[in-house]
Amino acid sequence: MRSHYNTDLGISHVGQSVKLCGWVNSYRDHGGVIFIDLRDRSGIIQLVCDPNDSKEAHEIASNARNEFVLIAEGTIRPRGEGLINPKLKTGEIEVVVSKLTIENESAVPPFAIADESVNEELRLKYRFLDLRNPKLYENFALRSKACIAARNSLANMGFLEVETPILTKATPEGARDYLVPSRVHQGEFYALPQSPQLFKQLLMCSGFDRYFQIAKCFRDEDLRADRQPEFTQIDIEMSFCEQKDVINVAETFLKDIFKACGKEIQTPFRQMQYKDAMENYGSDKPDLRFNLKFIDVIDIFAKSNNEIFANIAKDTKKNRIKAIRVPKGDTIFSKRQMQRFEEFVRKFGAQGLAFIQVKEDGLKGPLCKFFSEEDLNELSKRCELEVGDVVFFGAGAKKTVLDYMGRFRIFLANELKLIDPNALEFLWVVDFPMFEQNDDGSYSAMHHPFTMPKNIDETDLEEISSIAYDVVLNGVELGGGSIRIHKNDIQQKVFKLLNIDEEQQKEKFGFLLDALSFGAPPHGGIAIGLDRLIMLVTGANNIREVIAFPKTQRAQCLMTDAPSPASNEAMRELGIKLRENIK
């Protein structure tokens, strides 16, 4: 029906006849000549409807309004001097219309498509209108390129695309499952998969050797700006591999994806042990686009005559005292800013935020009186302090200090505008602990219970490490993976350490344990979050900008009004009756 998309046209097409299709983005009547900005998925081009060129087209144009669907035929001509619009890709040209058809009319739209100030809830309610914005279209065009590049890259490395079930069995993977009642087997439920984890391991047991899938996953968890109840991941698994093999494959297809999206990245990526990431940056996904690395000063504070700090410093296993040096910070930060910094860290469990300023005549601040001159000199040397610097200190329980100082590091970087928005800093975080302690004192698997432990016979669960790895980009976890347990006895031992008894093992994981009993190969894999990846590549403000029909932060679809009550008939067929006032 059309000859071109709007932005395929430029100054080189002057004099050419074209046929264009799209929507009225804006309409202007300038003394008899009507100008219409015609929008298609690629962008906007200006139509000129002059009665001297076509009286019929001009008359039809006079009836057009915003979001009417038009088909326009005409000739490309250059815009007049001083009329070029540098904001448009087609800003040097316009179309003199000879024939115009109104293909469909539109109700008055609730908002202008290009209006960026529109409330997001209104945009999501009318998502089909919101998606007419060419800026959003560009996100999905890039997403499509990324998926094609991933498929081609993995196929070239010998991976086979296999689809795994959506209706499956509930298994504990860290979040709540979405349950689907069975009509045929009343009182029983399917679960939507949180990941294809167990099925891809079974494919390795089946001898498929290399699998991938662009998989839809579901998790019923509290939402954040970068999370959705349903999301997509690039999921891979491979047999007869070590950690380095999986990392090499992941770097290869990530490089191909970024190339398809017009960005070059350097491989191999940096690697950092989990414990170093936590101790130096307060995060297992550190943003390395800026420095502000922690400095360990607990041994120096142990010598202070401040009772609080000295007591904290006595237990170096459970407690931490960390410093962050800000070069020239004393010359930058106002008193009010320093107060804001303390208010910020208090929100995350800090008792306060101590600091020392470096003046021309030495170190200054309330802390200084608790140290000898020798200790202050050692502190200055350790922190590499110079005149004009300020150094902040966090002290207390290990988990709390690392958390709030890690958050404070990011807060400082934003205050100081240290982050280059165009930089791409990749990092592998490796050697994760196998288990982590919950608030109630119990333990759970840090990644998942199918991860291969390095030292399974260690009696202290917190000392058992795993062959697990996360890939991080600009402080965002893109994905994670591990080498899997491929021996039945090791898998059962891990289950036992997690207090999953034999009966529960058989009920929930019997099929996996069976598969591991029939010659399962060594295997491992990784999953990359496609939505997060595209969010970072496009620079989108949140993950909803790269998902066609996303849910809100309350897990609702405002457009379709999902979730919604089921009919009484549907409930009867499923054998379900809702109880009131369940707590």
From Swiss-Prot:
Full protein name: Aspartate--tRNA(Asp/Asn) ligase
Gene: aspS
Catalytic reaction(s) noted: tRNA(Asx) + L-aspartate + ATP = L-aspartyl-tRNA(Asx) + AMP + diphosphate
Native source species: Campylobacter jejuni (strain RM1221)
One of the protein's GO biological processes: aspartyl-tRNA aminoacylation
Xref: HAMAP family: Asp_tRNA_synth_type1
InterPro entries attached to this UniProt entry: Aa-tRNA-synt_II, aa-tRNA-synth_II, aa-tRNA-synth_II/BPL/LPL, Asp-tRNA-ligase_1, Asp-tRNA-ligase_1_N, Asp/Asn-tRNA-synth_IIb, AspRS_core, GAD-like_sf
Residues binding ATP, per UniProt: R219, D220, E221, Q228, E477, G529, L530, D531, R532
Function: Aspartyl-tRNA synthetase with relaxed tRNA specificity since it is able to aspartylate not only its cognate tRNA(Asp) but also tRNA(Asn). Reaction proceeds in two steps: L-aspartate is first activated by ATP to form Asp-AMP and then transferred to the acceptor end of tRNA(Asp/Asn).
Pfam assignment, any one: GAD
Phylogenetic lineage: Bacteria, Pseudomonadati, Campylobacterota, Epsilonproteobacteria, Campylobacterales
